[in-house]
From Swiss-Prot:
Its main location: plastid. Residues 71-91, 526-593 are annotated as: Disordered. GO terms for biological process: glycogen catabolic process. This is Alpha-1,4 glucan phosphorylase L isozyme, chloroplastic/amyloplastic. The gene is PHO1. The keyword Flavoprotein does not apply. Its cofactor is pyridoxal 5'-phosphate. It is found in: Plastid, Chloroplast; Plastid, Amyloplast. Found predominantly in cotyledons and early seed coat. It is an enzyme of class 2 (transferase). Belongs to the glycogen phosphorylase family.
Length: 1003
């Protein structure tokens, strides 16, 4: 049965034609674009309809690397011939773009047509660009449908997209025409682009990585989609006041999002609470509870110089209309009447809601399950539709790859099992086989204590059927562990079970408990005499040594990319592991033994990811080794084939080509081609020109032009004036103790103190002028991080108003750091700081962006720093600090009172306490760097340990900067050595080695 479906060319009247309903619910067919250009006769109706009919009948000639010729041949030779004569892409001219913008300015309902000011100009321009995306967006989806290719689905709680306008027209190669069109309308493209708010869908590198990956997937023509949540208020907007950081709700959706298409026809039910019952057929049924609807919002993601345009599908949540209690409302009980609606909508209010309360924890778990459930229902519906009349579930892993970006989407595993078993009727064995072959997991965490865990009681209440499935998976794992290690050594088996089980502090199922009890009894009887002889002091010593041995395994770490507000919990876990929590042992008064608290039952999400997926990858070489040797060592020994490395990358389109056009032109001029944008290996050709004076002159001019722009931006944003002739020294990333902004600002304080001790001539001779720029958000409940923000701003307020110092030193904290601010700062940067405690950063991606833009780096051997230093050359990287393998030993020395602080470090602390930076009490902040034990003390992140080498390294920075020819050469070599860190390379590796997908290119 045919239905009337609307198919559109972006610059034409909507064309109504009778086509099969194929895909109208789950694809893009049916989206109503605006009629724009028929009124101006730019594109003829008949040619538009002919092109649309061609798209409907079959798709396009295709380049496909799968090697399966039978799938890739287009059978209809007539359509093939027509494809040769059809335009391969849409390239509007300036006149048609002007007409398009005018149309949207008049008919877009967000604004009054009486005015055409900058906000209206942005919305109208964005909608015009979106129209240009629709044709490729539909064609890409249609072709995936036709070929039924294997498709990757990237699930992430964050997508930090940044502004979309310049990126979209850049990828479409329409920057020039749009700039000219807006000029004819009396606007500058740059001014219009600045009206766009950053999409508040992420916070840190976790979300930015996901967005870079989408750009690369589209550019490289891989069949893939992203799935996330549509947060109404984002994480928060950061304001800096005299009291430090203040958080307010993001307002990025205040004027709507012109890039998204609301898909009210694509929604899925998501259930919470309820109970599990067994039906007459013996099957489990999850019934009752609270139902909400997840509604799709689609955002087209264009590739660079390709027709491929993939999709980012974001879910919003709402309650069904029948959930509104009309009787209660009419009775005056308005809050009660709309309670269900409010409960549903708040799931997607903010990213990472505070989880100190049970309500906050519940909301976070609801967010994670909503993402997983709605996305999997959508994926499965697409698989079934593409499969046609006969669905073979064994083919599911051959058509679908699901990548979990960190542990937030872990519930994909039990949810896929639930759907396959309870709804599709598969056996446990078949469902488990399919799930393991479909799902893969990216780890971003190097500290075992930071791995996500959920209360089993909470999960059992909220998702009762999923807990049953997780318990069964845990039983499968127990069987595997027993089969691997046997029962002869009960202590070893017990250790492995405690380390590897998905459920923590949960008793073994009866069948396994009996095995262990019998084994333990046999072992105890056979060794009874030996045990008696070893009672007493020896036993205590053995226990002590065992504890130290466990400590030796620790490398330390924090959550790599995302900031989900777990810092306080992680710090407590660290303290407990180190034995630095205050204890009553040694209290001289005898006390009655306190009852031992029952440890909470927990679900270890990372363990579930490892068990339930077919691949586990780290995000930098050193991180992947830590994952194998420490974080998941027991699993690595059991399944070494699962573990891989996929060093992160960033898209060179956004992070050089579009954000740094001056440098891009220079690179193209000297390499002789723009191919480096798609093939970054060509950047290495810059090495042979590194000493060329003409290139160096151009390089410095481009850098200074960017610095002038940043100086104007800083004056507007912060009120501080800076000199573009100073060195721009930048540290921008979320505020966290392990990232050590405190080390940076302590170094600045030391520099300031030394300046104050000199006369003007001495200061000028001994110090290179610097502008020290900070940016990043502290999580709202992370008190120590917020103290660091306050301290930085206090130092800046003092230093920047000191007439004796002038332009020799400025300290600027940029509020509300985001992608757009990064695109401004990174091209202007000359030194960037990546100074985390060694072994605690999984990878990092900002270091890659800085390197691409010719910025020198000072840092530790941590995360991707290790590989960046290898690629750019050790002589072009300022290295300092302890190595990862030394960290545990240094902490032990501190605990034993062997650490002797550097006098310069003590000097800085005393200077801060003198009140020179204001009356704020910094005892808590400085106290965290003092003492040898105690929670929140003992300098866990080794600021004092690395302070001397950091200062000495900064002296080397000053020395190098004075020789501008040498510095410029180093800068060029950083760009030349950054080719490895393109997200294109990373995506190729994922596609080949984890997802098993091939490029599919529309022509």
């Amino acid at each position: 049965m045919a239905s009337m479906t609307m198919r559109f060319h972006p610059n034409s009247t909507a064309v109504t034609e009778s086509v099969p309903r194929r895909g109208s619910v789950y694809g893009f067919i049916g989206y109503r674009s605006s009629s724009l250009f028929v009124r101006t006769n730019v594109i003829k109706y008949r040619s538009v309809k002919r092109n649309l009919e061609f798209r409907r009948r079959s798709a396009f000639s295709v380049k496909c690397g799968s090697g399966n010729e039978a799938k890739q041949k287009v059978k209809d030779q007539e359509v093939q011939q027509e494809a040769k004569t059809s335009p391969s892409s849409f390239a509007p001219d300036t006149t048609s773009i002007v007409s398009s913008i005018k149309y949207h300015a008049e008919f877009t309902p967000l604004f009054s047509p009486e005015k055409f000011e900058l906000p209206q100009a942005f919305i109208a321009t964005a909608q015009s660009v979106r129209d240009a995306l629709i044709i490729n967006w539909n064609a890409t989806y249609d072709y995936y449908e036709k070929l039924n290719v294997k498709q990757a689905y990237y699930l992430s709680m964050e997508f930090l997209q940044g502004r979309a306008l310049l990126n979209a027209i850049g990828n479409l190669e329409l920057t020039g025409p749009y700039a000219e069109a807006l000029s004819q309308l009396s606007y500058k493209l740059e001014d219009v682009a600045h009206q766009e708010p950053d999409a508040a869908l992420g916070n840190g590198g976790l979300g930015r990585l996901a967005s870079c990956f989408l750009d690369s997937l589209a550019t490289l023509n891989y069949p893939a989609w992203g799935y996330g949540l549509r947060y109404k208020y984002g994480l928060f907007k950061q304001r800096i006041t005299k009291d430090g950081q203040e958080e307010v709700a993001e307002d990025w959706l205040e004027m709507g999002n012109p890039w998204e298409i609301v898909r009210n026809d694509v929604s899925y039910p998501v259930r919470f609470y309820g109970k599990v019952v067994s039906g007459s057929d013996g099957k489990k049924h999850w019934v009752g509870g609270e139902d909400i609807k997840a509604v799709a919002h689609d955002v087209p993601i264009p590739g660079y110089k390709t027709r491929s345009t993939i999709n980012l599908r974001l879910w919003s949540t709402k309650a069904a209309s029948e959930e509104f209690d009309l009787n209660a409302f009419n009775s005056g009980r308005h809050t009660e009447a709309s309670e269900a609606l409010a409960n549903a909508e708040k799931i997607c209010y903010i990213l990472y809601p505070g989880d100190e309360s049970i309500e906050g924890k519940t909301l976070r778990l609801k967010q994670q399950y909503t993402l997983c459930s709605a996305s999997l229902q959508d994926i499965i519906a697409r698989f079934e539709r593409r499969s046609g009349a006969s669905v073979n579930w064994e083919d599911f892993p051959e058509k679908v790859a699901v990548q979990m970006n960190d542990t937030h989407p872990t519930l994909c595993i039990p949810e896929l099992m639930r759907i396959l078993i309870d709804i599709k009727g598969l056996s446990w064995k078949d469902a488990w086989n399919i799930t393991q072959r479909t799902v893969a997991y990216t780890n971003h965490t190097v500290l075992p204590e930071a791995l996500e865990k959920w209360s089993m009681d909470l999960m059992e209440k909220l998702l009762p059927r999923h807990v049953e499935i997780i318990e069964m998976i845990d039983e499968e794992l127990i069987r595997t562990i027993i089969a691997e290690y046997g029962t002869a050594d009960s202590d070893l088996l017990d250790k492995k079970l405690k380390e590897m089980r998905i459920l923590e502090n949960v008793e073994l199922p009866a069948e396994f408990a009996d095995i262990l009890v019998k084994t333990k009894e046999a072992t105890d009887i056979s060794s009874e005499e030996v045990q008696i002889s070893k009672e007493g002091g020896e036993e205590e010593e053995t226990s002590k040594e065992g504890g130290e041995e466990e400590e030796e395994k620790e490398v330390g770490g924090g959550r790599e990319e995302g900031d989900d507000g777990k810092e306080d919990e992680v710090e407590k876990a660290i303290a407990e592991k180190d034995g630095t929590v205050k204890s009553s042992i040694g209290d001289k008064k005898k006390k009655l033994p306190e009852p031992v608290p029952v440890p909470p039952k927990l679900v270890r999400m990372a363990n579930l990811c490892v068990v339930g997926g077919h691949a586990v990858n780290g995000v930098a070489e050193i991180h992947s080794e830590i994952v194998k040797d420490d974080v998941f060592n027991a699993f690595y020994k059991l399944w070494p084939e699962k573990f891989q490395n996929k060093t992160n990358g960033v898209t060179p389109r956004r992070w050089i080509r579009f954000c740094n056009p001056d440098l891009s032109k220079i690179i193209t001029q000297w390499i002789g081609t723009e191919d480096w944008i798609l093939n970054t290996e060509k950047l290495a050709e810059l090495r042979k020109f590194a000493d060329n004076e003409d290139l160096q002159t151009q390089w410095r001019e481009a850098k200074r032009n960017n610095k002038v722009k940043v100086a104007a931006f800083l004056r507007e944003r912060t009120g501080y004036s800076v000199s573009p002739d100073s060195m721009f020294d930048i540290q921008v990333k979320r505020i966290h103790e392990y990232k050590r902004q405190l080390l940076n600002i302590f170094g600045i304080v030391y520099r300031y103190k030394k300046m104050k001790e000199m006369n003007a001539a001495e200061r000028k001779e001994n110090f290179v002028p610097r502008v020290c720029i900070f940016g990043g958000k502290a999580f709202a409940t992370y008190v120590q991080a917020k103290r660091i923000v306050k301290f930085i701003t206090d130092v800046g307020a003092t230093v920047n108003h000191d007439p004796e110092i002038g332009d020799l030193l400025k300290v600027i904290f940029v509020p509300d750091y985001n992608v757009s601010v990064a695109e401004m700062l990174i091209p202007a940067s000359e030194l960037s700081q990546h100074i985390s405690t060694a072994g605690m950063e999984a990878s990092g991606t900002s270091n890659m962006k800085f390197a691409m833009n010719g910025c020198l780096q000072i840092g530790t051997l941590d995360g991707a720093n290790v590989e960046i230093r290898e690629e750019v050359g050790a002589d072009n990287f300022f290295l300092f600090g302890a190595k990862a393998r030394e960290i545990v030993g240094l902490r032990k020395e501190r605990a034993r009172g062997k650490f002797v602080p550097d006098p310069r470090f003590e000097e800085v602390k005393k200077f801060v306490r003198s009140g020179v930076f204001g009356s704020y009490n910094y005892d808590e902040l400085i106290g965290s760097l003092e003492g040898n034990e105690g929670f929140g003390r003992a300098d866990y992140f080794l600021v004092g340990q690395d302070f001397p080498s950091y200062l000495e390294c900064q002296e080397e920075v000053d020395k190098a900067y004075r020789d501008q020819k040498k510095w410029t050469r180093m800068s060029i070599l950083n760009t030349a050595g950054s080719s490895k860190f393109s997200s294109d390379r990373t995506i190729h590796e994922y596609a080949r080695e984890i997802w098993n997908i091939e490029p599919v290119k529309l022509e």
